[in-house]
Amino acid sequence: MPIIACSGVSKTYRGNARLVHALDDISFSAEPNEFVTFVGPSGCGKSTLLKIVGGLLDRSAGDVTVKGEPVLGPRRDIGLMFQTAVLFDWRTALENVLLPVEVLRLDATAYRPRAQDILKMVGLEGFEASYPNQLSGGMQQRVSLSRALVYEPDLLLMDEPFGALDEFTRERLNLEIQRIWMERRKTVLFVTHNISEAVFLSDQILVMTPRPGRVARIVRVSFPRPREIRLMKTPEFASLVFEIREILGVA
């Protein structure tokens, strides 16, 4: 059974005294442990769709289920990571990671070793006591990722998490995300404008149309894992990137 299933999802909202049709008849599913990415032009509803799946935003029509259950609001088995790290300046890296544990009223003392292990896993061992202003942008995003993983959610939603980073840092974090995903075997929904990033990371890519966002095509990616950066230099990779660019009308 798919861990995520969307059927006929639409979203309309009022903006500037007029109705905005953000999403129209979106249908897709994701299997357990699958890495699924949404790509499309700005304003096509990628982030809106992600928030609907996460229970952060109501849909206007259609059905969304996670583990066979209708999504009626935020769920404890879903972790979230956004484009900016959204860390509290007055909390250390470790304290920021433990924040959702406190919000969920879990035992922070019991989760502390897990938080330390995750920070080590993302390469931040020794920075547990550092504050956000002492960390680079890439390091802050690693803290944000650790925070999303600390209570072991089954599903991870990532909304352009590396969009503000330089290309070198972005590639390093793509490798980190792949490694962590392969170790932890989460289902990931990922939003990006970067087609190469989508192809590198994904099993399945939803290519979306301009507003109102629809699924233009679902593209499957079958490159074996683990994938290395040099994959991006191959003709096969370039061909798939070009195929998606053609679907988007930017080839």
Where do the language-model regions lie?
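The feature captures the beta-strand-to-loop junction immediately N-terminal to the Walker
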Residues: 39-41
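Helix-to-loop junction immediately C-terminal to a conserved catalytic motif
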Residues: 54
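Conserved ABC transporter NBD signature motif
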Residues: 62-74
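Conserved ABC ATPase "signature" region
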Residues: 98, 102, 109-127, 179
